[in-house]
Amino acid sequence: MTTKKLYFLSISIIILVAISIAIHITLNSNTKTRLTNDSQQQIDTIIEHDLQKGHIPGASILIVKNGKVFLNKGYGYQDVDKKVKASPTTKYEIASNTKAFTGLAILKLAQEGRLNLNDAVSKHVPHFKMNYNGQNETITIKQLLAQTSGIPSDITSEDAVTNKNNRLNDVTRAIMGDELHHKPGEEFEYSNMNYDLLGLIIQNVTKQSYTQYITDHWLKPLQMKHTTFKQTNYKSKHDAIGYELQGSTPVVSKPEFNLWDTPSAYMMTSTEDLEHWIKFQLNPPDKYKSLVQQSHKNLSSTIGEPNANPYASGWFTNNDEHLVFHSGTLDNFSSFILLNPKQNYGIVVLANLNSEYVPKLVEHLNTQIVNHKRYSTVASILNQYKDQFNIVTVLMTTLILLAFIFSAYRAWQMRHGQILLRRSKRIAVLSWLTLCLCIAIALILYALPYLILGSNNWSFVLTWLPIEIKLALITTLIALFSTLIVILLFLHTKITKT
């Protein structure tokens, strides 16, 4: 009996290792460099999975790579009640992704000599004054850009500020003399007021309203013809309706908002228009190249916030992965823009719900793009063997049933006194070895996505695997552990002599 058990264990290990080696060899063979139809299907599956998990009514998603649009598509509904589907022309409130436009505008004005980044804010906003430890402190434009001014993140949360002051000048007057959280330039603290003040500086320097300046000098030249700024809660034909979750149900939401927050939060745009913005960021014309590169450079370290990334001019950065990105959240909208200038691609996700699944979706799409050769190869190979995987599922299901029948029969025998328990050091050692084998198999299976595909987990991989492969994997896993249970029963029981 021991020989048979060891033989079965050896065969199980050999099969598992052989499968892993075969997949590994396949993945390291030559692959096509272009994104295939399988990749498109994988991306659709990933997107639909994350939108469903987040209960997101609608989203528009843009992927630009090497100057070409790989994906620009709507998912779900921009208006659930009227059954209006989301599309590339659907306009969303992009929240804090407005800041990159404000930051770039400030850098352009500095390049033109109309202001200096080291200028005191009070030079361009004469009435502006704030204190630290009771003493007046000078805040510079650069510190506003870097989010190191010391202005509290919650400075505009009081009703006295948010409800009664709806213009940039008014709100800056309302906070005059307030206390800073930190001495300017010393610590990072994210605050919308930093970029609202930059918007006011743009107005005072250019003698135009913030919205008009951005429209004339950035939106029109970039052919972002349909991009606007929020003025009311009225929704036009192409505007997405915003939603908030009640339980797991999205309900229409029209929260109050403040016009003075426009430079930091209230641009309204679509993936169709943002296509021009992303291409500009990744491959700017020569006359703008140094300006765009400057806007991506770190201005501050976010040491004040654990696990945060450095901040540039309206962008967070991740130097290790060469990423430039920013999220945007309102009560009823969320957005995320990610750029990888080194590998020349960008991802945009706009959604009509504030959801943690928006950044998760961007992370999944980013991983998909970085590893698309491997994913395309895996998908194309697995799809060729769907019938074989169905056979595996049937065989594994049969094995599971046999293991269940044997275990049930062994339990019946034990209840009727037909078998005895074995106790010996040798049995204990074999049991521990079996348990260790069980744990080893579990760890190998858990780590397979990382070992084969790189920096992924099963929950992500399962979103794009075909159902035939999922069933084969699940039944194989259950069959392996069922077999281990049978082995343990063989080791620990013996039939009594009659």
Curated annotation (Swiss-Prot):
Keywords: Cell membrane, Membrane, Transmembrane, Transmembrane helix. Its precise function is unknown. Has no penicillin-binding activity and is not involved in methicillin resistance. The chain crosses the membrane at residues 6-26, 389-409, 433-453, 471-491. It is a multi-pass membrane protein. The keyword Metal-binding does not apply. InterPro entries: Bact_CellWall_Synth/Modif, Beta-lactam-related, Beta-lactam/transpept-like. It comes from Staphylococcus aureus (strain MW2). GO terms for cellular component: plasma membrane. The keyword Membrane applies. It holds the Pfam family Beta-lactamase. This is Protein flp. Has two of three conserved motifs typically found in penicillin-binding proteins (PBPs) and beta-lactamases, but no penicillin-binding activity has been detected. PANTHER family: D-ALANYL-D-ALANINE-CARBOXYPEPTIDASE/ENDOPEPTIDASE AMPH, PENICILLIN-BINDING PROTEIN 4. It is found in: Cell membrane.
